[in-house]
C-alpha cells in the first residue's frame, strides 16, 4: 500500500513542467522523466555534436508520440553507436561459440560436454557466459531437448541420440556488454515431423524480421511470427518470449509472440532486443513443475523448437547482431 508521500509523487499532485539543468537554466521534463538538453549542449548519444544538430528533433518526436499515448521506450534503453559496437564485440564471441558447437555436436555427446565447450570457448575469447550464476542458474548454457521448451540444464546424464532435436541457447558478456542467441540442432537423422518443426520455427523468426518497420510497433513482430506458426499447424508459447538486451542481460521490452499488429512498444532506432519464439508441435500449454526450478516442458510432451536472434532497430530497418 502506498503512503501519502508516494501517492503524491506518483501523480496526485501536479508536477512542474520544468526543472533546472546543471547550468541553472530551465529545461522541460521529457516523457521519460529526464530533462531536455539545451540546444547547444553535447548530445546524449556520444556523437560529440551539439544537441540541436543531432538528436533534438528525434527527442521531440519521441516526446510527441508518448503524449499521444504510444508506448515509447525511454531514451536510456536506446543504444548509442558506441554501445552497439560493444554489443557487436560480445556477439562475435557468442556467434563463435554456436559455430563451434555446430561443428562438434552429434550423437553420443552429453549436454554437460556442450556446457564445457561453451565455458571454455567463451572464457578463452575474453568473455563470460552470461547464464552462469544468473539468478542462481548453475550452468553456462541452456540445452533443451525435444519436449523441453527452455532452460534445460546441461547434465552428464543427458546424452544426445539419433533423432533428437536440441536448442542450444548461448549468452555472452564481454567488456560489460551482453549478447544472446540460440540455434536448433538436429542430431543425426530426425523424423520429418521434427525437421519440419525446426524449419518452420526458423522461418517464423524471419517472418518476424520482415515485419520490422522503424517507428512501427513491437506487436507487428509477434503477430507475424504467430500467424506463420498457426498457418503451419503449430502453437506459440505465451509465457516466454524475447527481451531487451545490451547493457544488461534482460532489459525492457518483453517481446511477446502472442500479439496484435499495431500494438506494443514503438520500434525506435537504437532499441535492441531478441526475437526468440518457442513453437510447439502440439498445444501451447507448458509445464513448469520441474523440481530444479528452471526446466520448462510442453504440457502434452510433444516436441518444441526455438531459434533466437538479437538485433538493433536502425533508421532504415534493423541490423542483426547475434544469431
Where are these regions (language model features)?
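Acidic/negatively charged segments and metal-coordination signatures
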Residues: 1-77
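Active-site neighborhoods and metal-handling regions in enzymes and metal-associated proteins
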Residues: 38, 47-53, 57-323
